[in-house]
Amino acid sequence: YVLSWLGKGNHMSERITFHTDLIGLMAYPIRPPSSPAMQNEAFAKLGYDYAYLAFEVDANEIEAGVQALRTLKMRGANISMPNKTLVGKYLDELTPAAQMCGAVNTVVNDNGHLTGTITDGVGFMRAAADNGISPIGKKMTIVGCGGAGTAIQIQAALDGVSEISIFNRKDDFYHRGEETVQKINSQTSCKATLYDLADLQKLKEEMDDSYLFVNATGVGMKPLEGQSVVPDKSYFRPELNVVDIIYAPRLTKLREMAKEAGCKTMNGLGMMLFQGSAAFELWTGEPMPI
């Protein structure tokens, strides 16, 4: 239902009242997201007197932004760059996933008590399940230790994935990967290991032993369109499920090779949709009418 309304607007002027509760996106700069259209149409469909608006809030203003949540008695907010790793210290409570990720993308205001969570990993796991991919109790291999990759790794471990092999170049994010591995191994029953992406033989070995492979890097989208973190299709086998969290282009070089090898594949569009629907549930207590 919501998908049919993305980008069309939703006649908000017809439903704003004196009692309308506010939910916001706090980011800088604001880039045209689908979030306002998607959330507002879902609120209208289920009869919630909520309005979702975007606000430019930079890193120097996020503390004031959180105070505005309290002062204006907003129901909550989505938090995007550059504020995801900064906002947590101004909140009253963080969920385990947010604590482990060191990042927040959703805030819920319950009568002045602000709870921060991160729904990126939840969105990934729900999108995978929606596509018939269930890594619970199984092994996955993932490339990328940025924000999205970390959220996926943490949520997968919390949800019960048995083993995660993480690959990243030895850049600034490699240290973040080391921290994530330590947290997963000490706080969950999942076994996590970090490897250098330059070791392509090890990458193939881990992929050969995995149920799921995930690309959580930007390799495959502009300006790296047509490139892949996996060198060729010999790394894939039909039993391997492959997810590339990139959704523009819809079909990346990675997924093209995986499809040729007979793999079930998925792009990142579902992850984006389901992370938004997870936030909607936190604010309303009801599933989003997707």
Which positions does each model-derived feature cover?
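Short helix-loop-beta connector
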Residues: 133-139, 238
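NAD(P)-binding Rossmann-fold cofactor-contacting core
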Residues: 161-187
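Phosphate/diphosphate ligand-binding glycine-rich loop within oxidoreductases
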Residues: 15-131
